[in-house]
Amino acid sequence: MKHNLILRVIAKYLFPVIALFAFYVQFHGDYGPGGGFQAGVILSVGFILYTLVFGLDTAERVLPSGILRLLASTGILLYAGTGVATMMLGGNFLDYDMLAANPVTGQHIGIILIELGVGITVFAVMLIIFFVIAGRGRT
């Protein structure tokens, strides 16, 4: 599919739309359906589309495996760090009320941080799995 001009043009225009929808799902998850897991899956599927059209080597140059591992661990640290921060502020693990003076604001901040951590981790892990499976048989 690397040499198909129509696919390349469509993929170049479609990826930003997919990414924008993923960010919408990510940040709308606090107020309605959606959240980190769904956004991570949508964003990774957009990048998988890019990989299928432009090739695995090109995709790995754009997003190397070291960056993906860093993103996966950053998401986990964000999730765990939010929980540890709430404990250090005198609450229970992931007791978001402690994150702000107003408990409702604290809930919103906590949920956004947790969902962001989940989204980053899901995005990175799905791409790591895809790259490993897609790269089998290469020498």
Where are these regions (language model features)?
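Hydrophobic alpha-helical membrane-insertion segments
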Residues: 69-85
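Hydrophobic cores of alpha-helical transmembrane segments in multi-pass inner/ER membrane proteins
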Residues: 45-51, 114-128
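Short, non-helical or kinked segments that cap or interrupt transmembrane helices
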Residues: 30-43
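Short, hydrophobic/aliphatic alpha-helical segments
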Residues: 12-29
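Transmembrane alpha-helix boundary signature
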Residues: 55-59, 83-98, 128
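Cytoplasmic juxtamembrane interface segments
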Residues: 5, 42-66
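Short juxtamembrane and helix-loop transition motifs at transmembrane-helix boundaries
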Residues: 1-7
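Short aromatic-rich membrane-water interface segments that cap or initiate transmembrane helices
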Residues: 101-116
